[in-house]
Amino acid sequence: MVFGIIWGAKNTLPEFAEQIKLLLGFGPVRQGERVLINGIPYRVEMMGVYSYLKNPLLTGGTLRLPLKDLVGMRSRPYDEKEPWFPCKEGDYVLIDGLSTWRQVKLQTPEETVFNWFEMEESMPTSSFMGRKIFNISATPFWAGINFSIAYKHRFEALGDLRDKLSKFVEEEIKKQPYGEHILYPWVDLAGFGDDSSLTFMVWVQAAPEAAHKYGAMSLDLTHIALNAANKYGWEIIRFKPVAVHHPEQAKVLLENSSTAVG
């Protein structure tokens, strides 16, 4: 029996000593600092037998943890500019590329819920934090298509054709419901397709106020490019959606693709 008590004390005393260090402010987790739990940042609000940690951007974002659960964790000082979460409820985000566009409906420590045309879907918040998130409600963003026309138009591609397409896109996109939030149209020759076509990038940059219309922008640009082709008699080869965040990336991808094919 005595041996059992000694053996138990041998195993528990080191952990108990670590808890005492935490309470006295000498441990690796300190009040007022930032700590990660399941990939989610929290601010250590209070240290005690039960400690309180908070993420201000999460619904139900206050955790109450027994002190022993903090043993083995490590906090750090943080800067006020550091975000506590990639987005807030109501924001529109792109997840792992331009094709997955969702509105954030609810975010808790366990689950992030999205709204997509009145349909709900969710994923564990820890998984969401591991994805590539682009918050288009927080910063200007790009939307666009690649528009391919016949190679026979090559002699005017860098002159009259590009100028006409650029002007047409600029005029027509501003007629859309979100037109006042369009910052900059970008039309340029991006490269050559495998089928002897000329591929143009047709992009627009929009302010965050237009984030709720992101889903319509690529479709609207397709309609606008089609109308331009019909007006000026250009032979269309294809339209192609893009899955990058900026037109320069689209251009690089096309150049690499052309090199690989060659």
Where in this protein do the model-derived segments appear?
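Conserved hydrophobic/aromatic pocket- or pore-lining residues that grip, position, or stack substrates
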Residues: 32
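Structured, soluble regulatory/oligomerization domains located on the cytosolic or IMS-facing side
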Residues: 1-5, 11-29, 37-42, 48-49, ...
